[in-house]
């Protein structure tokens, strides 16, 4: 019996394979003991006493959604093999000198096997900058994965890569089609738990985003899914303390790009005092002050993206706005919106004129010529990182490198102040 090629580089539990397949696979104990504690070998979580089963074994609750791992069982994997050498890059665009410098740095990182952090402002053109290094590894017969914590980011990346690369591309997330083996994979970071020493190059985009940031299980997945001699590259527009520390310790090389691809500065957020938003919302009405800002913006006819702190408030705001602005086509999206992707596309195509969103759209999506309002910008869910990302939706396109970016608040907090300061610093660093 021959090994199913789709199994190469993948990690399996006992119940996912037939008896014959298990005999062909390499084996790992499902759990390991260290300093008197038990750890799951798939997700590296510490096994708790209450996860004990009546049959006399422990199970891991942390990665249970990926099929149960039990201490009395084995994990199985099939070593990855090289792909045929090929020429995969179809993209013939031109990088700016700033992008070119980062692209060159990444090619050198592969040659020197140096883990690298790319800290590039929102709208710098990070995707194009990784093309050369992705192509280099695939052309040599290697396997590459682009991973992100956010499904929306994965879908955007997948669309872009399909246009610009000639090889097959597998897209993996919670509701995607089954995996098929291909030299280029786009996956949510959770999906990396299903791989073992599979990739020559793993690029993790949006490393500052939930659910990846401060998640030891996903850090382990990133480490485990790369070959022993493979390379990890991290992309971010807002670095984290953890990454900055690794740069200081020399564990990561940092490549900076403080300038957007079109050469114009990042838009500086404008804080606007708004103390009566919730008072009016509770009465199912719109704050007159907020209404006047929306009316003024709608006269421009540019699309308007409004960020709300919570799903319930966002839904309510969408209903009120539709009453107040009957000529506008208004949508609302959150992590639980079933037709989110369709609404996002409708907004991009101009079929929706106002879109209200939770932080789900704070990153990885581009809407040409958009203006952005954040209501309750001082809400605890709007961190410095998320406010910088939200701000990065404005002024991304060459057609309109400017735009309105308004932070409505009822008290300036540290997150708003730090976000504004960091955006100003990035512009200064870019010489703008």
Curated annotation (Swiss-Prot):
* GO-annotated biological processes: DNA recombination; DNA replication; DNA replication initiation; double-strand break repair
Domain Helicase ATP-binding intervals: 107-257
Q: Where is this motif: DEAD box?
A: 205-208
Recorded hits in InterPro entries, A to Z, give: DEAD/DEAH_box_helicase_dom (IPR011545), Helicase_ATP-bd (IPR014001), Helicase_C-like (IPR001650), P-loop_NTPase (IPR027417), PriA_helicase (IPR050880)
Please give the name of this protein. Answer: Competence protein ComFA
UniProt EC number: 3.6.4.-
- The Helicase C-terminal domain is annotated at 289-432
Main subcellular location of this protein, as a coarse class:
cytoplasm
Q: What class of enzyme is it?
A: hydrolase
Protein keywords: ATP-binding, Competence, Cytoplasm, DNA-binding, Hydrolase, Metal-binding, Nucleotide-binding, Zinc
Q: What is the name of the gene encoding this protein?
A: comFA
Quote the subunit structure annotation.
Monomer and dimer in solution. Interacts with DprA and ComFC; ComFA-ComFC form rings about 150 Angstroms in diameter with apparent 6-fold symmetry.
Query: What PROSITE patterns does this protein's entry cite?
Result: HELICASE_ATP_BIND_1, HELICASE_CTER
Result of altering residue 205 to A: 100-fold decreased ATPase activity, no change in ssDNA-binding
């Amino acid at each position: 019996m021959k090994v199913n090629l789709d199994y190469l580089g993948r990690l399996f539990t006992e119940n996912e394979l037939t008896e014959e397949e298990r005999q062909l696979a390499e084996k790992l104990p499902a759990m390991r003991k260290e300093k008197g504690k038990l750890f799951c070998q798939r997700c590296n979580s510490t096994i708790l006493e209450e996860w004990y089963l009546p049959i006399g074994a422990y199970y891991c609750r942390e990665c249970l959604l990926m099929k149960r791992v039990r201490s009395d069982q084995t994990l199985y994997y099939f070593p990855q093999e090289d792909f045929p050498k090929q020429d995969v890059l179809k993209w013939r665009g031109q990088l700016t000198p700033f992008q070119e410098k980062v692209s060159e740095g990444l090619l050198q990182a592969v040659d020197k096997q140096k883990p690298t952090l790319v800290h590039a402002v929102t709208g710098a053109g990070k995707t194009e900058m990784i093309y050369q290094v992705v192509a280099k590894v695939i052309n040599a017969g290697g396997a590459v994965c682009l991973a992100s914590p956010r499904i929306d980011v994965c879908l955007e990346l997948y669309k872009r890569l399909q246009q610009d690369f000639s090889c097959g591309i597998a897209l993996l997330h919670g509701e995607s089609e089954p995996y098929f083996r291909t030299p280029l994979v786009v996956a949510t970071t959770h999906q990396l738990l299903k791989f073992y020493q599979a990739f020559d190059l793993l690029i993790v985009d949006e490393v500052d985003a939930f659910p990846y940031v401060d998640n030891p299980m996903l850090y382990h997945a990133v480490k485990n899914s790369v070959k022993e001699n493979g390379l990890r590259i991290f992309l971010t527009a807002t670095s984290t303390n953890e990454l900055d520390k690794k740069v200081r310790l020399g564990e990561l090389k940092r490549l900076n790009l403080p300038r957007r691809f079109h050469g114009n500065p990042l838009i500086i957020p404008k804080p606007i005092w708004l103390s009566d938003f919730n008072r009016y919302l509770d009465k199912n009405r719109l704050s007159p002050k907020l209404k006047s800002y929306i009316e003024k913006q709608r006269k421009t006819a540019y699309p308007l993206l409004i960020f709300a702190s919570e799903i319930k408030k966002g839904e309510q705001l969408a209903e009120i706005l539709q009453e107040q602005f009957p000529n506008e086509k208004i949508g609302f999206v959150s992590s639980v919106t079933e037709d989110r992707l369709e609404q996002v596309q409708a907004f991009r195509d101009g079929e929706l004129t106002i879109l209200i969103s939770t932080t789900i759209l704070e990153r990885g999506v581009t809407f040409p010529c958009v203006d952005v309002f954040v209501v309750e910008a001082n809400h605890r869910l709007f961190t410095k990182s998320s406010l910088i990302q939200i701000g990065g939706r404005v002024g991304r396109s060459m057609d309109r490198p400017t735009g309105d970016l308004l932070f409505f608040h009822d008290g300036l907090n540290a997150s708003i102040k730090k976000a504004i300061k960091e955006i100003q610093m990035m512009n200064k660093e870019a010489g703008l």
